[in-house]
């Protein structure tokens, strides 16, 4: 959803912020 990362859920990022 934002910030980058390997995936997204409920509009929130999760995973490494690359």
Swiss-Prot record:
One example GO MF annotation: neuropeptide hormone activity
Subcellular compartments: Secreted
GO terms (BP aspect): neuropeptide signaling pathway
Keywords, ordered alphabetically: Amidation, Neuropeptide, Secreted
The keyword Secreted appears for this protein: yes
Matching InterPro entries: Pyrokinin_CS
Modified residues (Leucine amide): 18
Domain of life according to the entry: Eukaryota
Gene Ontology CC: extracellular region
Disulfide bonding pattern of the chain: none
Main location: secreted
UniProt family annotation: Belongs to the pyrokinin family.
Free-text function comment from the UniProt entry: Myoactive.
Protein name: Pyrokinin-5
